[in-house]
């Protein structure tokens, strides 16, 4: 028996079946670095329209976690897809390098500044520490396959950037947005510093919940407001609070003008509470027997005076919109030094903003006998006892509630009025302009707009000063007596900025004011404060984007961060850009959700459910991590676990297998010589190229909409269904058995070539390593890297006017699916071994029958059977099976006639007709020794 194996065109490629990504990716990365791939891309894209995704700087502290990976991978997918869409999209990664977490790390290792070394040495150690952290994180980000200018990232501690941050503040001052005030700010007693809004987290805490009576100075006058005369005992306004420690700073009681208040007689005294809260208050203070003596609106009680229970002075009743009926008594204890609402209303009434608490959270000397030097949280019990002694305590209980805590220390924080510098939201219309700018930005997902609008609408003035060592100095000089800014502030700030540009922020602390202001130094002093780190990162649109040459003066198109950044980086950037330039710093803002485990729980080291990106890359490879990110809907929480990553690895295998099949069957194909013109191609091959065109249209549209899980779904549908279970199955016979350079085979290879050229580009933004690998195995002349090109423009499809158009092949797909069901059943019943052992008869209604007979002899190749014929539906044999999907179709199956051809494995009755090739069928004889078979349709 002759061996005909050598006459077959068997698939062959060096592209490995197994990805072995964890082993192979580092080698590819080394090549990318050696070749300066990022530089090659920039050169290739020079002069194209720009798309700038500005990197929100991660904090230079600790190893990267899964959330960092999600963020950087999403950015990389966008930058690479924009490149393929014809944009020049430079990506400059950045790091946030100043601030408290770095100070704390350096303190832990070396001690506090001033203890063992100077503040200047401390700053040098902070700079050193931040630099090592940047290097560690950079390695991991590069390992993810993220392309960017990693050799020249921006750091907020670069001397240039530090100088430009000072200039940004100068511009804001010049535009009239800065003011000084003793406003209550979030204050961490452990950090001994003000905290930004974004540095506050909420945890459950048990606090004392107390009801306190403030006695009216003129009981009769207050009772008269209720139309009451025969009052027994003192008249008291009742407040409810969970922060007894703030009572020494009380300077008023707030009521709501429109709320109804009642005067209630209980044993020995009369109480004033909100009418709607009367029952709950009486229940709380354990009073069953009471009489309502009268009622009045809050407005009637304005400026009536009440005696502070223990401070020895009296306070007014004032009116505020912040008073609600949600809880308490309807009367709010008001301490302007300890709360933003209290501060605002106290300002309105011109009340003293008292702050008896020091930076360490203890009462200042002279606060009250026995309280001086006591920690405020420890003082709660003392104050409760004091109120009890004074007869002012109506009730005390414990309340578990959500309480603001420091993001670093996880300890409760306080509101504390300290002299600070603020960016005013309203004195020059910053709030109104910011709200206007928000409307011109595209927010993705769109609920981001309402979220940031409500935050901007309700936020207080932004406290930008900090009492820290490692930060950009405010670089201000104030009059020693009046504390007014120097009249030449902007010039002086520019002078400081120039020095910082040369020597970094230490230049400020080394500066002798005489050097830049002469004799004015006698009456002006340096402001010792540093800037909030959110000012550092929030001004990068100016300190980085406006000055980096690769951005060529273009503003950022997109900011992309986690959804917590509405109140963080998106907010600070919007405030600074609007205050400086009157406009938003971005055109689009995309937010992604947080990572959770497979059960939807927050990642936590204590639960042990964290997924380390380093582990995933070392075990499965970065492309699997990238595929997981792309296939997860980032608009909500993003679940990740070993099981979920295993599913991503399975999907990856399907894509890799498709790519390998394509490459293996392009063996021996030279696109310069072997390409078949579209009009001469087999119809099914043109259909397959059309499928790729439709898929590409969908995929490109999904990339443009940043809908990456849709990209992955469409890619999987193309690989698994349109190609895997239909086209690639059908063409194996023609591909392997036809004459090597026949039109039948070259037509098929032409289709596979076009599909491969398109597919490698579709996967490049997501599966970057795999795309690079595939690219290296594709035939034909090409650029060195897929990343320098654009979407493939060589695809074409079938015209709708053709008889065998897309709709025709869709119908054939369905028929084939129905035939497969019958064959599978026959295999299960042991009637046939494989589909080529089958002969099928399709009983079809006239319209469908016409479609099937149009294929003539080639119908069997589409059905993957050795024989196939079409008969009238009405003449169906009794054993024909009715299709569930297609009403006008019945399928009958029999064993194929004849013998199995050892070369093509089809069953046929013409084996042995040609003496020289007596073992093979007539079709194979033609393909081996004759002109080769002709295929028109499939």
From Swiss-Prot:
Catalytic activity reported: tRNA(Ile) + L-isoleucine + ATP = L-isoleucyl-tRNA(Ile) + AMP + diphosphate
E.C. number(s) listed in UniProt: 6.1.1.5
Record note on quaternary structure: Monomer.
Residue sites binding L-isoleucyl-5'-AMP per the record: 561
Binding-site residues for ATP, renumbered to this chain: 605
Bilayer-spanning residue ranges: none
Intervals of motif 'HIGH' region: 58-68
Free-text function comment from the UniProt entry: Catalyzes the attachment of isoleucine to tRNA(Ile). As IleRS can inadvertently accommodate and process structurally similar amino acids such as valine, to avoid such errors it has two additional distinct tRNA(Ile)-dependent editing activities. One activity is designated as 'pretransfer' editing and involves the hydrolysis of activated Val-AMP. The other activity is designated 'posttransfer' editing and involves deacylation of mischarged Val-tRNA(Ile).
Cellular localization per UniProt: Cytoplasm
Protein name: Isoleucine--tRNA ligase
């Amino acid at each position: 028996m002759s061996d005909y194996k050598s006459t077959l065109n068997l698939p062959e490629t060096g592209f490995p079946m197994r990805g072995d990504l964890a082993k192979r990716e580092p080698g590819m990365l080394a090549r990318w670095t050696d070749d300066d791939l990022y530089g090659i891309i920039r050169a290739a894209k020079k002069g194209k329209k720009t798309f700038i995704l500005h990197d929100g700087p991660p904090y230079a502290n600790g190893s990267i976690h899964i959330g960092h990976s999600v963020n950087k991978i999403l950015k990389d997918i966008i930058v690479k897809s924009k490149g393929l869409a014809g944009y020049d999209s430079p990506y400059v990664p950045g790091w946030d390098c100043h601030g408290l977490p770095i100070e704390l790390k350096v303190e832990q290792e070396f001690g506090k500044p001033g203890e063992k070394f100077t503040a200047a040495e401390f700053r040098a150690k902070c700079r050193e520490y931040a630099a090592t952290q940047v290097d560690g994180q950079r390695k991991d980000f590069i390992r993810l396959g993220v392309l960017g200018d990693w050799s020249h990232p921006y750091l907020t501690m670069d001397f240039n950037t530090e100088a430009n941050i000072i200039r940004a503040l100068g511009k804001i001052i010049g535009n009239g947005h800065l003011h000084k005030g003793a406003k209550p700010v979030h204050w961490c007693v452990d950090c001994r510093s003000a905290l930004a809004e974004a540095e506050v987290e909420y945890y459950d805490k048990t606090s004392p919940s107390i009801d306190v009576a403030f006695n009216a100075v003129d009981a009769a006058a207050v009772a008269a407001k209720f139309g009451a005369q025969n009052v027994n005992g003192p008249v008291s306004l009742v407040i409810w609070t969970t922060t007894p420690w703030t009572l020494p700073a009380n300077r008023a009681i707030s009521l709501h003008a429109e709320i109804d208040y009642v005067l209630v007689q209980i044993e020995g005294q009369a109480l004033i509470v909100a009418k709607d809260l009367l029952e709950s208050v009486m229940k709380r203070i354990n009073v069953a027997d009471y009489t309502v003596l009268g009622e009045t609106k809050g407005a009637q009680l304005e400026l009536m005076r009440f005696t502070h229970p223990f401070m020895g002075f009296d306070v007014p009743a004032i009116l505020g919109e912040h008073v609600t009926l949600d809880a308490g008594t309807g009367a709010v204890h008001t301490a302007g030094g300890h709360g933003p609402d209290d501060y605002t209303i106290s300002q309105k009434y011109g009340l003293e903003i008292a702050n008896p608490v020091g930076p360490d959270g203890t009462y200042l000397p002279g606060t009250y006998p026995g309280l001086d030097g006591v920690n405020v949280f420890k003082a709660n019990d003392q104050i409760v006892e004091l109120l009890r002694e004074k007869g002012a305590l109506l009730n005390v209980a414990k309340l578990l509630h959500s309480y603001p805590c420091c993001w670093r220390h996880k300890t409760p924080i306080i509101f504390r009025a300290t002299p600070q510098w603020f960016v005013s939201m309203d004195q020059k219309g910053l709030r109104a302009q910011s709200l206007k700018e928000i409307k011109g930005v595209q927010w993705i997902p769109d609920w981001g707009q309402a979220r940031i609008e409500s935050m901007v609408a309700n936020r207080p003035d932004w406290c930008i000063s900090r009492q820290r060592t490692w930060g950009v100095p405010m670089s201000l000089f104030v009059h020693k007596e009046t504390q007014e800014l120097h009249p030449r502030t902007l010039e002086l700030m520019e002078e400081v900025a120039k020095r910082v540009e040369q020597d970094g922020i230490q230049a400020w602390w080394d500066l002798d004011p005489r050097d830049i202001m002469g004799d004015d130094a006698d009456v002006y002093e340096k402001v010792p404060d540093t800037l909030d780190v959110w000012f550092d990162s929030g001004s990068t649109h100016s300190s980085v984007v406006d000055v980096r040459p690769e951005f060529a003066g273009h503003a950022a198109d997109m900011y992309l961060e986690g959804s917590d950044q509405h109140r963080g980086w998106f907010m600070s950037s919007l405030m600074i850009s609007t205050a400086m330039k009157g406009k938003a710093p971005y055109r689009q803002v995309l937010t992604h959700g947080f990572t959770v485990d497979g059960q939807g729980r927050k990642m936590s080291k204590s639960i042990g459910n964290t997924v380390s990106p380093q582990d995933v890359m070392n075990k499965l490879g970065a492309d699997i991590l990238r595929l997981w990110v792309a296939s997860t809907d980032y608009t909500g929480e993003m679940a990740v676990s070993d099981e979920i990553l295993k599913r991503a690895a399975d999907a990856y295998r399907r894509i890799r297998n498709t790519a390998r099949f394509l490459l293996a069957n392009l063996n021996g194909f030279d696109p310069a010589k072997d390409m078949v013109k579209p009009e001469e191609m087999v119809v099914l091959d043109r259909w397959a190229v059309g499928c790729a065109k439709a898929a590409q249209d969908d995929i490109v549209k999904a990339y443009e909409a940043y809908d990456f899980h849709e990209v992955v779904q469409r890619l999987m549908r193309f690989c698994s269904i349109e190609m895997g279970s239909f086209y690639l199955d059908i063409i194996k016979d023609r591909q392997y058995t036809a004459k090597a350079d026949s039109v039948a085979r070259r037509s098929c290879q032409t289709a596979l070539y076009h599909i491969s050229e398109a597919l490698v580009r579709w996967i490049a933004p997501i599966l970057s390593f795999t795309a690079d690998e595939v690219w290296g195995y594709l035939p034909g002349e090409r650029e060195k890297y897929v990343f320098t090109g654009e979407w493939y423009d060589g695809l074409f499809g079938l015209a709708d006017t053709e008889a065998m158009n897309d709709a025709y092949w869709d119908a054939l797909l369905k028929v084939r699916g129905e035939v497969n069901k019958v064959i599978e059943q026959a295999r299960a019943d042991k009637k046939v071994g494989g589909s080529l052992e089958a002969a099928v008869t399709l009983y079809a209604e006239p319209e469908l029958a016409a479609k099937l007979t149009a294929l003539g002899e080639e119908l069997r190749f589409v059905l993957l059977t050795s024989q196939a014929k079409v008969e009238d539906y009405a003449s169906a044999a009794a054993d024909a099976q009715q299709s569930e999907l297609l009403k006008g179709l019945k399928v009958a199956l029999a064993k194929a006639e004849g013998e199995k051809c050892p070369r093509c494995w089809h069953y046929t009755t013409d084996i042995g007709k040609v003496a020289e090739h007596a073992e093979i069928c007539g079709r194979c004889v033609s393909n081996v020794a004759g002109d080769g078979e002709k295929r028109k349709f499939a």
